[in-house]
């Protein structure tokens, strides 16, 4: 029997680990420079926590068997877990709270997706306890700075407003609202064309409600009689005016996120490839989510975003030097079995400065084979150890510098 990773899981080998760590470290530095602190939440949560009062669909959760009666699952995203932690563990702390994370999430695949990847890596932030223009602008500026630090080239920012889009959906008959919303989420124009008149034309107009703020404002005129639409759109324009011009911005009022807890701005970052636009980040405002976890229904406003690490890695050029494995400086070789204790002590002494990398020779090889191993690994010094004599030091620096660099 050949053992493989479970369906939807994969191994990440050293070179890919190095690439991922390079990216995560740069994102982490940006997060920290804006005052964000790292939070780690459980991989396993109760199903009630993960589904966030019904705003996260249970079918996306990979459920696991626990020791108790309460259903458990692997987190499909982090926002719900952080909201739960903020209510249960961080109550009374000074607001706003700026939190960031870098971790894995799990999403169940079904039907045609069965067998696809089910574990994903994310890095993101949550800003809790702040609402209004300044908080929304901070998040969008933070997204842009991250992309700039990673030297991402061309990128597109799609900005919508979940509340405003819900107001527009509210103009449809109740029996059609779910259908129209699903079509928007799935970019399904064909199904909208099958709706009865006059709702078909109105749904298609909503589907196409994207472009520059000026273009969207003109198309939004047919909904000007809907209460609050004009004022809400004016606030959205004010926010976009604050966002730096390093990203091409498209206002998209047809934008619908898969999680239903968003109450304000929502956004996506797309990067073009040769064949498609790749989604590398998404986020938005969720001012009612924390009330789900509070015993009295009290809430704290929140906004955040997440980078999809795997997708972002495909769009970032990582310098080859960043992926080089740090080489060991010493190879410590016990000449006999009796010299092993002395070799272990000598290797530990060499490591005392905290920065020297030392390997212990483990295989029974000839001296020439030992030297060949050291040259292949670019180890410049060999310490030959006897049980009753001082170490003999052999320098191989000339041979090492002529070898190809070993990568992990």
UniProtKB/Swiss-Prot annotation:
BP-aspect Gene Ontology terms: histidyl-tRNA aminoacylation; L-histidine biosynthetic process
Q: In which pathway does it act?
A: Amino-acid biosynthesis; L-histidine biosynthesis; L-histidine from 5-phospho-alpha-D-ribose 1-diphosphate: step 1/9
UniProt keyword annotations, A-Z = Amino-acid biosynthesis, Cytoplasm, Histidine biosynthesis
Pull one GO CC term from this UniProt entry.
cytoplasm
Known Gene3D superfamilies for this protein? Bira Bifunctional Protein, Domain 2
UniProt subcellular location: Cytoplasm
Could you cite one Gene Ontology molecular function of this protein?
histidine-tRNA ligase activity
**Chief localization:** cytoplasm
Family matches, as InterPro entries: aa-tRNA-synth_II, aa-tRNA-synth_II/BPL/LPL, HisRS-like_core, HisRS/HisZ, HisZ
What HAMAP family does UniProt report for this protein, alphabetically? HisZ
Family note:
Belongs to the class-II aminoacyl-tRNA synthetase family. HisZ subfamily.
Q: What else is known?
A: This function is generally fulfilled by the C-terminal part of HisG, which is missing in some bacteria such as this one.
Q: How does it assemble?
A: Heteromultimer composed of HisG and HisZ subunits.
* Protein purpose: Required for the first step of histidine biosynthesis. May allow the feedback regulation of ATP phosphoribosyltransferase activity by histidine.
Question: What name appears for this protein in its UniProt entry?
Answer: ATP phosphoribosyltransferase regulatory subunit
Lineage, top ranks? Bacteria, Bacillati, Cyanobacteriota, Cyanophyceae, Acaryochloridales
The gene name on file is hisZ
């Amino acid at each position: 029997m050949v053992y493989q990773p479970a369906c939807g899981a994969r191994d990440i080998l050293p070179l890919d680990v190095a690439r991922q760590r390079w990216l995560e470290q740069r994102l982490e530095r940006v997060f920290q420079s804006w005052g964000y602190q790292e939070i780690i939440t459980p991989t396993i949560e109760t199903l009630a926590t993960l589904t966030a009062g019904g705003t996260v669909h249970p079918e996306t959760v990979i459920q696991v068997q626990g020791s108790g009666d309460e259903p458990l699952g692997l987190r499909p995203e982090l926002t719900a877990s952080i909201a739960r932690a903020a209510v249960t563990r961080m109550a009374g702390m000074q607001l706003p709270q700026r939190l960031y994370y870098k971790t894995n999430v799990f999403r169940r695949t079904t039907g045609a997706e069965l067998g696809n990847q089910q574990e994903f890596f994310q890095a993101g932030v949550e800003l809790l306890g702040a609402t209004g223009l300044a908080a929304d602008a901070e998040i969008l500026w933070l997204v842009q700075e991250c992309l700039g630090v990673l030297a991402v080239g061309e990128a597109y920012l799609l900005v919508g407003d979940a509340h405003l889009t819900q107001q527009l959906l509210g103009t449809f008959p109740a029996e059609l609202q779910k259908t129209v919303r699903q079509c928007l989420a799935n970019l399904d124009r064909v199904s909208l064309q099958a709706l009865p008149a006059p709702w078909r034309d109105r749904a298609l107009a909503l589907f196409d409600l994207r472009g520059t703020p000026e273009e969207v404002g003109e198309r939004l005129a047919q909904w000007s009689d809907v209460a609050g639409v004009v004022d809400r759109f004016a606030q959205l324009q004010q926010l976009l005016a604050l966002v730096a011009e390093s990203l091409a911005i498209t206002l998209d009022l047809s934008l619908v996120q898969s999680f239903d807890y968003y109450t304000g701005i929502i956004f996506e970052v797309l990067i073009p490839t040769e064949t498609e636009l790749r989604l590398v980040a998404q986020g938005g405002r969720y001012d009612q989510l924390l009330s789900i976890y509070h015993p009295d229904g009290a809430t704290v406003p929140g906004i955040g975003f997440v980078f999809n690490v795997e997708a972002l890695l495909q769009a970032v050029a990582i310098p080859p030097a960043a992926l080089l494995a740090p080489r060991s400086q010493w190879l410590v070789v016990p000449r006999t079995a009796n010299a092993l204790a002395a070799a272990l002590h000598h290797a530990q002494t060499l490591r005392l400065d905290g920065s020297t990398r030392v390997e212990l020779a483990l295989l029974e090889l000839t001296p020439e084979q030992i030297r060949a191993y050291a040259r292949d690994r670019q180890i410049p010094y060999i310490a030959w150890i006897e049980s009753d004599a001082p170490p003999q030091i052999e320098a191989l620096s000339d041979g090492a510098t002529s070898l190809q660099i070993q990568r992990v």
